[in-house]
Amino acid sequence: MREIEISRAIVEAYFNDLLQNLQLDIAIVGAGPSGMVAGYYLAKGGAKVAIFEKKLSVGGGIWGGAMGFNRVVVQESAREILDEFGVDYSQVGNGLYVLDSIELASTLASKAVKAGAKIFNMVEVEDLVVKDGRVSGLVINWTPVMMTGLHVDPLTVEAKFVVDSTGHGAQISQHLLKRGLIKAIPGEGPMWAEKGEELTVEHTREVFPGLYATGMAANALAGAPRMGPIFGGMLLSGRKAALEILQKLGK
């Protein structure tokens, strides 16, 4: 075993993965709960999908549960998704279920990858490709390049649909806002768990031609309430976006 063999294996495998994912059916930005669920259902439905995550780890806000207590809650309407993914839970009354946030995050990631979604971590989306009034791809760079402010030109990824799953900041939609292509991003409202969960799913939609918003990004775009450590809306939002996109792609 030589060190160069290890290096060559890593470089060749990653290069081939990246090359194979420069042209996609769907590019998802953000590997949080809604993004990974969307990736799972899209891949399962036969679409070519990749998820781009700027952080080193995937999972978004799942890991820390609530105030560091690594448990989260999911409501009855999303329980079937937990069952499909094989996540364990315990009923705590009123149609609520408590589960281990570590199991949830790791299982969502594993199931998405096993279904065929490719996850690229440490890759940040610095802009969008917009042609003829439609989002048609991503402008990507390494997260460390973005963090250090180095003047390094990016690469692009082509996609028939882009999904903004970047959470509270709706960071991908912000690129459209600053160009005047969408009118406003009100940001999320004060805490109201029940209404926030309901509206998260309701506002999961195509917010601009070629661009869907899911999860807390959808909430931020609609000015809907935040909901705290209940994650059913995130799961349902990802599934809803995936099924709508698959239908539009004729899958």
Swiss-Prot record:
Cofactor(s) this protein requires: Fe(2+)
Please tell me where Fe cation binds in this chain.
153, 168
The record's family statement is:
Belongs to the THI4 family.
Gene of this entry: thi4
In Swiss-Prot or TrEMBL terms, this protein is called: Thiamine thiazole synthase
Pathway field of the UniProt record reads: Cofactor biosynthesis; thiamine diphosphate biosynthesis
Name the Enzyme Commission number(s) assigned to this protein: 2.4.2.59
> Which InterPro entries does the record cross-reference, listed alphabetically?
FAD/NAD-bd_sf, Thi4_fam, Thi4_prok
Q: What is the lineage of its organism?
A: Archaea, Methanobacteriati, Methanobacteriota, Thermococci, Thermococcales
* Cited function: Involved in the biosynthesis of the thiazole moiety of thiamine. Catalyzes the conversion of NAD and glycine to adenosine diphosphate 5-(2-hydroxyethyl)-4-methylthiazole-2-carboxylate (ADT), an adenylated thiazole intermediate, using free sulfide as a source of sulfur.
Supply one GO molecular-function term.
pentosyltransferase activity
Q: How does it assemble?
A: Homooctamer; tetramer of dimers.
Protein keywords: Iron, Metal-binding, NAD, Thiamine biosynthesis, Transferase
What's the catalysed reaction?
hydrogen sulfide + glycine + NAD(+) = ADP-5-ethyl-4-methylthiazole-2-carboxylate + nicotinamide + 3 H2O + H(+)
Keyword flag Transferase: yes
Record: residues binding NAD(+):
34, 53-54, 61, 125, 151-153, 216
Q: Biological process GO terms, please?
A: thiamine biosynthetic process; thiamine diphosphate biosynthetic process; thiazole biosynthetic process
Name any one Pfam family assigned in the record. Answer: Thi4
Which residues are noted in the entry as glycine-binding? Answer: 226
